[in-house]
């Protein structure tokens, strides 16, 4: 996707390109921190917050745009995918008991995951055919993000536990995706000849939906973590009595 080659941008964008670069670095760093923190927390807690269905969609998105439509700077996508392999392993190994308590289900979970990746890759390719690669890159990425945010919030409420998750994981993914959205709207303003498509009601709705879902997630996580900490303190007091 040559559209992401910012060296070809008009002069008015070049003057403020450093701001776009900062947002891109923050985006890349945020999600790398999220991935590494997810792997570390999963092995510490023997649980993983990452829902498998959104993860398969995200992996398909990375595969499609790494192999078929690589943007300039695509090594970061490749690095994301490499680290994501650790997230995949963690999510499959420490899948919630409801998804892995049956031996047959647990045995075929990796196969089902691969099939899901193939299905989502088909969807991303269809989106590219309808919208062209550049818009599909962002709309597909936001679809993955909203699935992740909604499923993570649902899992947090359903399990009533913060095991497998952390403030670092939540905050880093919020910072990463917020930087991606800020960069997108920034380019739509300063480079409208190529990026005006991003300044529309649907993209603003996607941004708002992400903010609401992950905002509610943060509040619910704080409430559960506070309750868990209080239970730990109460248990310690009972042991000393």
From Swiss-Prot:
PANTHER family: INTEGRAL MEMBRANE PROTEIN (AFU_ORTHOLOGUE AFUA_5G14600), PTHR42038
Pfam family, any one: Pyr4-TMTC
Bilayer-crossing regions: 19-39, 49-71, 76-95, 108-128, 137-157, 166-186, 202-222
Phenotypic effect of disruption: Abolishes the production of 15-deoxyoxalicine B.
GO cellular component, one term: membrane
Similarity annotation: Belongs to the paxB family.
Pathway recorded for this protein: Secondary metabolite biosynthesis; terpenoid biosynthesis
Organism: Penicillium canescens
Topology in membrane: Multi-pass membrane protein
Species lineage: Eukaryota, Fungi, Dikarya, Ascomycota, Pezizomycotina
Keyword Ribosomal protein carried by entry: no
Function field: Terpene cyclase; part of the gene cluster that mediates the biosynthesis of 15-deoxyoxalicine B. The first step of the pathway is the synthesis of nicotinyl-CoA from nicotinic acid by the nicotinic acid-CoA ligase olcI. Nicotinyl-CoA is then a substrate of polyketide synthase olcA to produce 4-hydroxy-6-(3-pyridinyl)-2H-pyran-2-one (HPPO) which is further prenylated by the polyprenyl transferase olcH to yield geranylgeranyl-HPPO. Geranylgeranyl pyrophosphate is provided by the cluster-specific geranylgeranyl pyrophosphate synthase olcC.
Note: The 15-deoxyoxalicine B cluster is a rare cluster that contains its own geranylgeranyl pyrophosphate synthase (olcC), in contrast to other related clusters which rely on a FPP/GGPP synthase localized outside of the cluster.
Localization of this protein: Membrane
Top-rank taxon: Eukaryota
Molecular function GO terms recorded: lyase activity
One BP annotation, GO: terpenoid biosynthetic process
Protein name according to UniProt: Terpene cyclase olcD
Primary location: membrane
Alphabetically ordered keywords of this record: Lyase, Membrane, Transmembrane, Transmembrane helix
Known EC number: 4.2.3.-
């Amino acid at each position: 996707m040559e559209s992401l080659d910012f060296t070809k941008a008009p002069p008015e964008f070049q003057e403020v390109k450093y701001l776009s670069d900062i947002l891109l670095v923050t985006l890349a760093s945020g999600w790398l921190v999220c991935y590494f923190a997810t792997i570390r927390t999963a092995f510490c807690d023997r649980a993983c917050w990452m829902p498998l269905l959104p993860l398969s969609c995200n992996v398909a998105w990375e595969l499609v745009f790494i192999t078929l439509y690589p943007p300039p700077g695509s090594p970061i996508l490749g690095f994301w995918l490499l680290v994501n392999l650790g997230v995949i392993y963690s999510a499959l190994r420490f899948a919630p008991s409801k998804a892995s308590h049956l031996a047959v289900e647990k045995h075929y979970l990796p196969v089902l995951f691969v099939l899901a990746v193939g299905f989502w890759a088909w969807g991303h390719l269809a989106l590219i055919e309808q919208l062209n690669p550049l818009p599909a890159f962002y709309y597909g990425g936001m679809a993955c993000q909203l699935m992740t945010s909604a499923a993570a919030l649902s899992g947090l409420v359903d399990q009533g536990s913060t095991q497998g998750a952390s403030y670092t994981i939540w905050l880093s993914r919020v910072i990463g995706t917020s930087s991606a959205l800020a960069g997108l709207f920034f380019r739509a303003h300063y480079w409208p000849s190529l990026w005006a498509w991003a300044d529309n009601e649907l993209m603003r709705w996607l941004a708002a939906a992400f903010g609401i879902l992950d905002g509610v997630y943060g509040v619910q996580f704080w409430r559960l973590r506070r309750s868990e900490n209080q239970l730990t303190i109460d248990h310690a007091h009972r042991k000393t009595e």
